[in-house]
Amino acid sequence: PDRIAHHIRPFWHAGKQVNVHVTDDLGVDAVLDAVAELLDEKPRFDHRTVLHHFGISTQAQSRRAAALGCAVQVNGYYLRYFGDQFVADGLGTERASLMTRAGSARRNGMSVALHSDLPMGPLQPMLGASILATRMSGTGVVLAPEERLSSYDALAAVTIEAAWQLKLDHEIGSLASGKLADLTVLDADPFEVDAAAWPDIAILATVLGG
């Protein structure tokens, strides 16, 4: 952990964006310590450092990450496919519920996006967004309901927030004058449908580079 800043330093000082995979609270501390050290060396006010997975974290870490200007990119499939197993055989209910704390991240002002980690999870954005909005395990247990995202934030996690983290929000991620008309036409309004049913919404058309 004490070498993370060493490895990131040349990219940081060159003005590059940093993306780090981190899955537990010890790892989160190590990455945040490195970001704090590098910010002291070379302040950067739009560095958009992204913590991928953000698996197990604390409220204090979420607040600190936000204060340091970090973003998180989470994988809700851990909740769906491994949540029950983590509760029963590994972490227990309390600690397993700390996985993928997207709700806290948003409340603390961080950008939250979603990835599938293919082949760990499928390339199904509506399913991924649904899991972040419901936090339902495979057996239907809701893990830490306070960490659910709103419908808006869950859908933003696969659109504008993902674009922002890629530094492509000036081109894609939302419909606006001067941006590409990338869009998907659905057969139902996800804001009028329960988030648990989002995976069942049919895709009628997709426009790319419009």
Report residues per predicted region.
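C-terminal accessory/binding modules appended to enzymatic or scaffolding proteins
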Residues: 4-6
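His/Asp/Glu-enriched, well-ordered alpha-helical/loop segment
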Residues: 9-19, 26-49, 53-54, 59-63, ...
